[in-house]
Every structure is written in structure tokens, then in C-alpha cells.
Swiss-Prot record:
Keywords: Cytoplasm, Elongation factor, GTP-binding, Hydrolase, Magnesium, Metal-binding, Nucleotide-binding, Protein biosynthesis. It catalyses: GTP + H2O = GDP + phosphate + H(+). Residues 81-84 are annotated as: G3. The keyword GTP-binding applies. The gene is tuf. Belongs to the TRAFAC class translation factor GTPase superfamily. Classic translation factor GTPase family. EF-Tu/EF-1A subfamily. It comes from Helicobacter pylori (strain P12). This is Elongation factor Tu. One of its GO terms (molecular function) is GTP binding. GTP binds at residues 19-26, 81-85, 136-139. Residues 60-64 are annotated as: G2. Residues 19-26 are annotated as: G1.
Length: 399
């Protein structure tokens, strides 16, 4: 198939398959690409091709992930699939593969299993906003009532983790049959079910806001004083747009300050505006150099607030990944690296959890010694003497 076929004018959405081991996530990923390839919307990817996922490093954590891309009539998709359960945990916590939505694969023959629940919980914790369900292996279930029972169980499980279980689209089919048919060059009735699934994904998972459309936020990396012009803070704009004349707040570490942008520069040239992804210098009116430091953020007033206490979902690096060799306990005090700076904080483990071993994932409560701009979904690294020992994401703000 000619590469030029991918038309970048379609809206782009990131999705992935989640679910219990051996329920058919990778087979479904292969089936989607195979069925869509018959319509000239994807390149056929073989199961083995997806299953032998290359290992990637994200903040020192080894994650095996497969990326495939395909289109529907309406959208362009980047799709991630992970071979192992641990890879999903790491992927979702580090945000290595940000998902705008997920396809939860549940075997109709087995119903929801422990990792089904765990992946739904993780999706809730790390902020995967929407889930569509594929009941796989429908060909192995003769009893329609059993199928309905599994569907009911899945809806209840989704609702238990605050997803709209009753309104979630659930499509039954057989990924393996669809894949075999598509390889033989036919869509067939099983392929139609895969197309139906993708139509639901198109309709149910909203197109995400682009980074430039979000509220302005820039982590401060450095601060300079320019004679006769004032204070310049530099950094990479995380989201949104900033222009001369904008009111901004400086948040984190100390009391929040308000100021006005009097200039935006990139590579020593004046810009009308800076936008998400740009490395810029922002000139601030009446702000003194000593009032701003690395680790603060510049943002649209009122859009983010400083916090000291939060809950997070973390993955603790294994010894092999260069992490700790020993467990840690409540009152462990590492540094939390948020955006551009380290802040010391103490960890409280959940009731009933005595210790955390390298390689575990766990929910923790953190109290920082100074406030940092935080919101749901903010990513952080846990460090000890400059060495990363864990990665996490803010799942709840306490104060």
C-alpha cells in the first residue's frame, strides 16, 4: 500500500487496547489493521509483528510497547498495544503513551478477570477519559444468555470505577476470525464487527483538544535579568498560547504572583506569540529576578493552583531498571521531580500495605515540603540523590 495514503487532515486520536492477559488484545490490534487495510486505510500488521514489541526507555523505565497506525473514514489513529501486564502499568503511569481513549478487550468465554479490573482502575487513576468494550471470542460462546451476563458484569465493573457503564458501547465479535478472513482478502461477518467497533470508537471517543487550545502553562527552567528590560523566564510551553499583553500567574514554591507579559522571544527574535512545544523566553513586567525560580510555572490566571498534599499512583523501578534494591515503608522521604524541579516529600502507604518492593505499583499519599503547581494527571518522578527510583501520576489532590 502506498504510504501517501495517510491523510493528515483528519483529526488525530491516540488509543490503545487494554484488558486481561490472553483475552485477545494483540489479536484485536492485528485484526483492526487487517480489516482496515482492505479498505486502503491501514497497513496490515501481523500478530507476531505487534507481539514482538520493541523495548523503549521512558525516564529510565523499560517498557515494551507496539505502536500501529491506521485510519477510519473520519480519523487518524495511533494505537498502542503492550505485551505484558507490567508494561501496561508502566505505560499508563509514565504517560509514555498518552491515551485519549481505550478499547477494553474482554473474553466472552471467561468474563472479566483480575487484570480487567486493574486496567479499568488504572484508567480511572491516570485519567484515560473514555472506554469502548470489545467482547472477544464470541464464536466460543453458544449461549446468548451467557454473553448477556458477561456484558452485564463488564458494565457493572465500569460503573464501579466511575465510568458510565450503562452508556458504554459494547461490541461482540471474534478478533481471530476477523483476522483470518481479512488475511484471505475478505471482510466477512466477523470483519464487519471490527468495523462496527471502530465506528463506535469514532463516535464515542471525542476528538481531544489540541495542546494549543488548552489553557497556557509553561514550567520555568531559567530566569535572567536583562538590563533596562526586566526579567526573562525561559522554558518550553507545555500547553496553550502566550502573547504580549497577556496576564499570567507565577505559581508554586512561594505565594502566587500576578504579572503581565511584555515580550515573547525565541532564538533572540521577538514573537507575536509562543505556543505549545516552543522553547521561549517570556519577559515579565515589574517582576524581580529573585522572585522567580526554576520549578515554578507561568500560567493563565486561576488555571492551576499550588498544592502540598496529594494521592498518586506510582510504579517503583525494579533493581534491573536501576531502581532501589530494597523495599521502602511509610515515611520514606525521597525527592519528587515535578516538571523542572525536585521537592522533598514524605510518603504514606495505604492501610494494610506494609512496604513497597522494587517493581511494584501502588497508590500513595504524599506531603511535599513546599507547594507545587499540581492538577489531576500531573506526572512526576521519584528520585533519590539524582537517581530515578519511581514514576507516578497525581490521581487526587488533598490540599
Amino acid at each position: 500500500m502506498a504510504k501517501e495514503k495517510f491523510n493528515r487532515t483528519k483529526p488525530h486520536v491516540n488509543i490503545g487496547t487494554i484488558g486481561h492477559v490472553d483475552h485477545g488484545k494483540t489479536t484485536l490490534s492485528a485484526a483492526i489493521s487487517a480489516v482496515l487495510s482492505l479498505k486502503g486505510l491501514a497497513e496490515m500488521k501481523d500478530y507476531d509483528n505487534i507481539d514482538n514489541a520493541p523495548e523503549e526507555k521512558e525516564r529510565g523505565i523499560t517498557i515494551a510497547t507496539s505502536h500501529i497506525e491506521y485510519e477510519t473514514e473520519n480519523r487518524h489513529y495511533a494505537h498502542v498495544d503492550c505485551p505484558g501486564h507490567a508494561d501496561y502499568v508502566k505505560n499508563m503511569i509514565t504517560g509514555a503513551a498518552q491515551m485519549d481513549g481505550a478499547i477494553l478487550v474482554v473474553s466472552a468465554a471467561d468474563g472479566p478477570m483480575p487484570q480487567t479490573r486493574e486496567h479499568i482502575l488504572l484508567s480511572r487513576q491516570v485519567g484515560v477519559p473514555h472506554i469502548v468494550v470489545f467482547l472477544n471470542k464470541q464464536d466460543m460462546v453458544d449461549d446468548q444468555e451467557l454473553l448477556e451476563l458477561v456484558e452485564m458484569e463488564v458494565r457493572e465493573l465500569l460503573s464501579a470505577y466511575e465510568f458510565p457503564g450503562d452508556d458504554t458501547p459494547i461490541i461482540a465479535g471474534s478478533a481471530l476470525r476477523a483476522l483470518k478472513k481479512a488475511k484471505a482478502g475478505n471482510v466477512g461477518e466477523w470483519g464487519e464487527k471490527v468495523l462496527k467497533l471502530m465506528a463506535e470508537v469514532d463516535a464515542y471517543i471525542p476528538t481531544p483538544k489540541r495542546d494549543t487550545e488548552k489553557t497556557f502553562l509553561m514550567p520555568v527552567e531559567d530566569v535572567f535579568s536583562i538590563a533596562g528590560r526586566g526579567t526573562v523566564v525561559t522554558g518550553r510551553i507545555e500547553r496553550g498560547v502566550v502573547k504580549v499583553g497577556d496576564e499570567v500567574e507565577i505559581v508554586g514554591i512561594r505565594a502566587t504572583q500576578k504579572t503581565t507579559v511584555t515580550g515573547v522571544e525565541m532564538f533572540r527574535k521577538e514573537l507575536e506569540k509562543g505556543e505549545a512545544g516552543d522553547n521561549v523566553g517570556v519577559l515579565l513586567r515589574g517582576t524581580k529576578k529573585e522572585e522567580v525560580e526554576r520549578g515554578m510555572v507561568l500560567c493563565k490566571p486561576g488555571s492551576i493552583t499550588p498544592h502540598k498534599k496529594f494521592e498518586g499512583e506510582i510504579y517503583v523501578l525494579s533493581k534491573e531498571e536501576g531502581g532501589r534494591h530494597t523495599p521502602f515503608f511509610t515515611n520514606y522521604r525521597p525527592q519528587f521531580y515535578v516538571r523542572t524541579t525536585d521537592v522533598t516529600g514524605s510518603i504514606t502507604l495505604p492501610e494494610g500495605v506494609e512496604m513497597v518492593m522494587p517493581g511494584d505499583n501502588v497508590k500513595i499519599t504524599v506531603e511535599l515540603i513546599s507547594p507545587v503547581a499540581l492538577e489531576l494527571g500531573t506526572k512526576f518522578a521519584i528520585r533519590e540523590g539524582g537517581r530515578t527510583v519511581g514514576a507516578g501520576v497525581v490521581s487526587n489532590i488533598i490540599e
